[in-house]
Amino acid sequence: IHKSVNLTINLPDVKDQLFTSLIDNFGFRTSSSTAQTLNPYDPLFDANTNKLKFGEIFSQNRKDSLHPLRIEIGSGNGDWVINQCRSSPSPANFLSIELRSDRIAKQIEKMALGGIDNLCVAGGECGKVLRDFVGEKSVECVYVNFPEPPQQRSGDKDESAGHMLKNENLEIIGRSLLGDGRGRFIFVSDNLS
């Protein structure tokens, strides 16, 4: 490694965040409201909407935090989105949404080792992350690159029920895109079925 990375970690904060994440991800918290869940992160959330304040997130690392927001859904290990962060022809901030925690860990490792400061990684089901944390008409572009095809289980009437691109999620994606034809949804797949 030719580049050194300076990370400051506040261990009590990390411990609290990991504990909160475990509670949320394993379903132990059933009666708390979204606002109660987000209390440890108040400076990064809008008090009126409970949506993430991406300007605040990105301004912690960069002088110009007002670049457009672009999102990749189902980012896997993060290769594509990290390459975009480095080489995008126009400056942008990126949000990566991934369901699997092992892949999220790989993305965060690549961010830290690569000095990436225009990427925010979110773990969770894409529709829930977009609905709960991303404001309406706030996203320049949503990318879905080569998603896993929907799997139909025996007895399922709706084969798209567990897929990230089910109708409900497509509606949420549409609401998150900039208005007046400025928002784009780019879907790339090699699956013909």
Residue ranges and their predicted role:
Residues 102-105, 160-161, 185:
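Conserved nucleotide-cofactor-binding alpha/beta core module
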Residues 68-128:
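SAM cofactor-binding core of SAM-dependent methyltransferases
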Residues 181-189:
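Conserved beta-strand signature within the Rossmann-like core of class I S-adenosyl-L-methionine
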Residues 152-164:
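Glycine/threonine-rich flexible loop motifs
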Residues 1-71, 79-87:
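S-adenosyl-L-methionine
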Residues 154-156, 188-193:
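Conserved class I S-adenosyl-L-methionine
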Residues 131-141, 146:
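A short acidic, Gly/Pro-enriched loop at the edge of an enzyme's catalytic core
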Residues 164-181:
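A short glycine-rich, Lys/Arg-flanked "PGG" loop and its adjoining helix->strand segment in the class I
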